[in-house]
C-alpha cells in the first residue's frame, strides 16, 4: 500500500496512536504453501466444473419442488452460486441460464421479509441443511448425494413454511 496510508498501522506514526489491524496471513509460509498446493489441485479446472455442475443440479431440483408445490419463489444463479428469490411473479425457468425479471436490478435488489428468511433458515436447519440467507454456494465436494439430500430438505422446508402460514 501507499506509505502515507500504511503509516496509520505503524507502531510509531504521526497520528499519535496505532490503528488496530488484525493482519493477514498472506506472508505466512504455511499459508503460502497451502495456497500453492490448492492452485495445483485446481489448475485443470475440474473442481470448478464439478462445483458448477452441482449448483446447476441443485437449482434445477429446487425449482422442480417450487413448480410442483405451486410456490411463487424461484431459484437461479450462475456457476456455483444458488440464489432463492421469494415472492417471484414471473415465468418459471426453462434452463439454467435463467435470471428473474431479465436481470432487472431494480426488481432483483430488494429486501425479503426478515421473518420469512428466519423461518426459511430454521426450516432448513431442522432438515439438516445449514443455509445462509437467501443464497448458497456449492463446492467440488458436493456429490449427487448431498444435492439430493438438500433438494429433499428444501421440499420439507417448503412444506413446513406452508403449514406455518409463511407461504
Report the location of each language-model feature:
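Conserved N-terminal phosphate-binding loop of PLP-dependent enzymes in the Aspartate aminotransferase
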Residues: 1-167
Amino acid at each position: 500500500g501507499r506509505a502515507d496510508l500504511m503509516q496509520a498501522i505503524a507502531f510509531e506514526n504521526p497520528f499519535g496512536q496505532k490503528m488496530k489491524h488484525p493482519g493477514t496471513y498472506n506472508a505466512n509460509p504455511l499459508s503460502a504453501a497451502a495456497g500453492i498446493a490448492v492452485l495445483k489441485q485446481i489448475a485443470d479446472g475440474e473442481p470448478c466444473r464439478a462445483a458448477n455442475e452441482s449448483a446447476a443440479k441443485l437449482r434445477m431440483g429446487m425449482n422442480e419442488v417450487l413448480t410442483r408445490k405451486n410456490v411463487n419463489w424461484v431459484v437461479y444463479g450462475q456457476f456455483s452460486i444458488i440464489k432463492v428469490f421469494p415472492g417471484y411473479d414471473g415465468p418459471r425457468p426453462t434452463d439454467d441460464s435463467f435470471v428473474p425479471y431479465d436481470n432487472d436490478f431494480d426488481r432483483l435488489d430488494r429486501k425479503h421479509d426478515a421473518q420469512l428468511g428466519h423461518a426459511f433458515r430454521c426450516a432448513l436447519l431442522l432438515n439438516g441443511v445449514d443455509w445462509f440467507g437467501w443464497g448458497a454456494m456449492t463446492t467440488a465436494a458436493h456429490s449427487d448425494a448431498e444435492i439430493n439430500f438438500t433438494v429433499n430438505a428444501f421440499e420439507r422446508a417448503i412444506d413446513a413454511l406452508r403449514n406455518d402460514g409463511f407461504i
